Amino acid sequence: MKLPVYATTGQKIGYYGFLTYFGLVFFFLIAPIFVVLPLSFSSSPFFEFTREFMSFEPEAWSLKWYRNMLNICSVEMTTVCTDKWMRGTVNSFYIGIISTLIATTLGTLAALGLSRPHMPFRALIMAILISPMIVPLIITAAGMFLFYSKLGITHSFTGLILAHTALGTPFVVITVTATLTGFDNNLIRASQSLGADTMRTFFKVIMPLILPGVVSGALFAFITSFDEVVVVLFVGSVEQITIPRQMWAGLRQEISPTILSMATCLVALSIALLTTVELLRRRSERLRGIKQR
């Protein structure tokens, strides 16, 4: 929004006050990243900006916390070298990828069903599907623990995958439903009139048009699973340790800059995934003929 050429004094004050306010909010949100990033390269075992570090002295900068994260031990380590960070990384990707695949499949099918005209109880079904986004996570985690305990799948990868699938499905439903808005059903009729069966119509006509929404929803589902800690604490065990759980345990048991190294990697991963989502959103708008602003 640009300031009008003939803006009054009050409009100018409101405009620049608006920019100042949101600039401060943005700084408040982004400032921790600028603290975590440099400290992850510090040689000090404490979360501090030493005089040598601020003077850019070579001995004050180090990659040892990244080596500790990768379980590459050395004699200069002042903390216990452990493989929990690598095990947590492997488990997080394992749980995240499988739960994302399941959530993407279920969410896409649900969105296609809800997009059909004259769908009965559409609002009720939609409310149930997106309820994991609305209900407080601690309540969802407690309910999952009680339900999974009766099924005997707590403290297992199966329980965590199912739990993260439930948390990720709403994101897929919402993004695919938004992509299907304005979808021309005449394309389906034209495909069927040319002799294509249901499966061929789906993969050759529908899927290419909704693919940006599907991938965006899948990325959001993966980020949700990768960054989730509350459900892991309820449903998982020591064997199912993930990166967020290891970071939480590290803050409680052993304050180590290795946590900052992992946080820096997670920030980089999040930026890459969100950039991909934005590129897919723009591609989807081009396919749907929406003018870029």
What residue ranges belong to the model's regions?
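N-terminal signal-anchor/first transmembrane alpha helix
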Residues: 1-39
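C-terminal transmembrane helix and the adjacent membrane-cytosol boundary/short C-terminal tail
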Residues: 2-9, 17, 177-192, 196-207, ...
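Short membrane-interfacial helix/loop motifs at transmembrane-helix boundaries
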Residues: 3, 31-81, 236-238
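Interhelical loop and adjacent transmembrane-helix boundary motif
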Residues: 6-15, 60-77, 226-283
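Transmembrane alpha-helices
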Residues: 20-21, 30-33, 173-179, 183-185, ...
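Non-cytoplasmic
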Residues: 41-49, 142, 146-147, 164, ...
